[in-house]
């Protein structure tokens, strides 16, 4: 490394120091998904970011999705995916594959990436330590012709109803980094597949996390000119939904952010997971890397 490169690194570390001190001993939940999960280079950068958070005294917790991988496995096994109102129906055979893919292959791949940095990651799902309990999701859809709402039966798709933070508190006091798959049991004995965004929001809310980061395939919330909005209050976010600035798939993402804040998260960030080291850029730089939503 040249003297000039060393000088640049030293300057960057000096600039990051106040933010390292701000987040020391604080919990940051990161929902890992989107394009970053399918790109080896971005995956390694993400693992490096999580390791550096831990080394800086932060308590990072990773929650991950895996929709495309689930779809690919179902296709390989010759199981046709069924959808209701645009949402995947998860029957008994499908939920077994969902658990196998999420809590098995994907979870362990992420754990291995983080472990390669020298840190200790541990793979979990909602079943471990009775961490999360779920119940059958109650989803409705409005018929555009009759304007009548009907209930969707999505099978074993669940909503989080309870989070027990005991295991996560224990891990926070250790050197372990939890990597959690969004699968959880119900009190009825069934296994439920849970949307990874809402699962991450429930975990972050139960822990009163300082930050919840959603890694997506977009820079964050954009205004009508296509420019990134750096910060929004909950009231401002709701107004942008109402006037159509926030639309399409960004609406449920922002609504999940709002629910997480109502549950106790101090701030939620939507940022671009396709940018290498976006987690560090968000946490350890002055202007962050995405859209911060606060109370």
From Swiss-Prot:
Q: Which residues form the signal peptide?
A: none
List the Pfam families: AA_kinase
Positions contributing to substrate binding: 66-67, 88, 193
Q: Looking at its record, which EC class is this enzyme?
A: transferase
GO CC, any one term: cytoplasm
* Pathway entry: Amino-acid biosynthesis; L-arginine biosynthesis; N(2)-acetyl-L-ornithine from L-glutamate: step 2/4
Which terms does the UniProt entry file under GO BP? arginine biosynthetic process via ornithine; L-arginine biosynthetic process
Q: Which GO terms describe its molecular function?
A: acetylglutamate kinase activity; ATP binding
Reported EC number(s) for this entry are 2.7.2.8
Q: Which UniProt keywords apply?
A: Amino-acid biosynthesis, Arginine biosynthesis, ATP-binding, Cytoplasm, Kinase, Nucleotide-binding, Transferase
Coarse class of the protein's main subcellular location: cytoplasm
Q: Where is this site: Transition state stabilizer?
A: 31, 253
Which ranges form a coiled coil?
none
Q: Which InterPro entries match?
A: AceGlu_kinase-like_sf (IPR036393), AcgluKinase_fam (IPR004662), ArgB (IPR037528), Asp/Glu/Uridylate_kinase (IPR001048), Glu/AcGlu_kinase (IPR001057), NAGK-C (IPR041727)
In its keyword annotation, does this UniProt entry include Cytoplasm?
yes
Catalysis: reaction(s): N-acetyl-L-glutamate + ATP = N-acetyl-L-glutamyl 5-phosphate + ADP
Q: Which domain of life is it from?
A: Bacteria
- Compartment annotation: Cytoplasm
Q: Which family does it belong to?
A: Belongs to the acetylglutamate kinase family. ArgB subfamily.
Summarizing the function annotation, the protein's role is:
Catalyzes the ATP-dependent phosphorylation of N-acetyl-L-glutamate.
What's the name of the protein? Acetylglutamate kinase
Q: Which organism is it from?
A: Rhizobium meliloti (strain 1021) (Ensifer meliloti)
